Amino acid sequence: MKPVVVERSTKETQIRVEARLGDGKATVDTSIPFLDHMMTALAKYSGIDLTIHARGDLRHHIIEDVALTVGPAIAKALPATAARYGDRSVPMDEALVQAVLDVGGRPYYQGPIPSSLYDHWMRSFCDAARFTLHLRVLRGEDRHHIVEAAFKA
């Protein structure tokens, strides 16, 4: 299966994403180590192979524009036979996050998670992919653990 390719080029960023159903392999280079880590986790736990290359002026611009590019790439990579709804709860040490997803074409995000940058990533991703996502932080104190559990869920 050929990967879906989505590119975004603005005054602030240049992003290229390839996505396809696969084994959850990831090749990610955004210049932001934590974002690379989250995109690798998203690929692994979704079973979607992702190749992401991103450059930009500010961390905030890169994070948002990666979301705006990964969203449609994943949406287009899903087969028409994919289940519309899904839910998963993921623990990460003291953190526990529940995600409920609808890929039916109605963009909406209900959070929050305790990081304004990555909460904004989720909202931008949902808007661009036209997905509905509800995230509930059931437990947790470490922001890294909560955000990572959210991406894995």
Go through each PLM region and give its residues.
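Polyanion-binding surfaces on beta-sheet-dominated domains and ring/shell assemblies
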Residues: 1-153
